[in-house]
Regions:
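Glycine-rich phosphate-binding active-site loops on the catalytic face of alpha/beta enzymes
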Residues: 13, 89-99, 131-143, 168-192
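Glycine/Thr-rich beta-alpha phosphate-binding loop at enzyme active sites
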Residues: 81-93, 110-157
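Catalytic cores of alpha/beta
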Residues: 31, 70-85, 114-126, 158-165, ...
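Catalytic domains of carbohydrate-active enzymes, especially glycoside hydrolases
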Residues: 28-43, 125
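Alpha-helix-loop-beta-strand connector modules within alpha/beta enzyme cores
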Residues: 53-72, 98-115, 144-170
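Active-site mouth loops of central-metabolism enzymes
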Residues: 7-25, 107-114, 165, 169
């Protein structure tokens, strides 16, 4: 889709669950300067909205400097308020059609867990990317849904919509996902 351009920047970086100090912004600037990151997702589940907006404004500047798409997790309202590049929606978050009315032509990505049916629904509703996972064990999040390369390959057969692979991705396993045509690799715990 037009909102996501193909390039060799395959990392979809996700924030730590808490941003405790100003050192984070310095680290983020360094990581984004590697020119391997396409997306940065702000994922602060337990933070107040006002703090998310405050933190989001700082991160947006860093993302813009490095030409990295800035994505907000779960919340189309904050996405719009920050004028972020897009929003990532889980299955229990706002419906994509409702989110699209708020966000217009911004990027909307959808969690599909390990389900081709959820992927088909997201494709029908014109999601900009599909996220599948967890592919591997992760220290960032308790694993509820486990997926595999078979699901990834099935998804690639039914759509050209970009696919983000999630869950426990690190140096020892990332190549297998890229070789099986995942477009982006979501990384959090391995970096932070």
């Amino acid at each position: 889709l037009k909102r996501i351009k193909k390039n060799n920047k395959f990392i979809y970086l996700i924030s730590p669950s808490k941003i405790k100090s100003n050192n984070f912004y310095i680290e983020l600037d360094k990581v984004l300067s590697s020119k391997k990151v396409s997306f940065f997702q702000l994922r602060l589940k337990k933070e107040k909205k006002t703090n998310k907006i405050f933190i989001g404004k700082k991160i947006k500047k860093i993302c813009k400097k490095h030409k990295v798409k800035f994505i907000i997790n779960d919340d189309p309202i904050i996405t719009k308020k920050l004028n972020a590049d897009g929003c990532h929606l889980g299955q229990k978050d706002m419906n994509i059609l409702k989110a699209r009315k708020i966000l217009k032509n911004k990027i909307i990505g959808i969690t599909c867990h390990n389900s081709i049916n959820l992927a088909k629904k997201a494709i029908k509703n014109k999601a900009d990317y599909l996220a599948f996972g967890a592919f591997y064990s992760s220290k960032t999040k308790k694993i509820k849904y486990r997926t595999n390369l078979k699901i990834l390959n099935l998804a690639k057969k039914i759509t050209n919509t970009p696919i983000v692979a999630i869950g426990g991705i690190k140096l020892s396993n990332y190549k297998k996902l890229l070789l099986n045509k995942a477009n982006f690799l979501a990384i959090s715990g391995y970096i932070w």
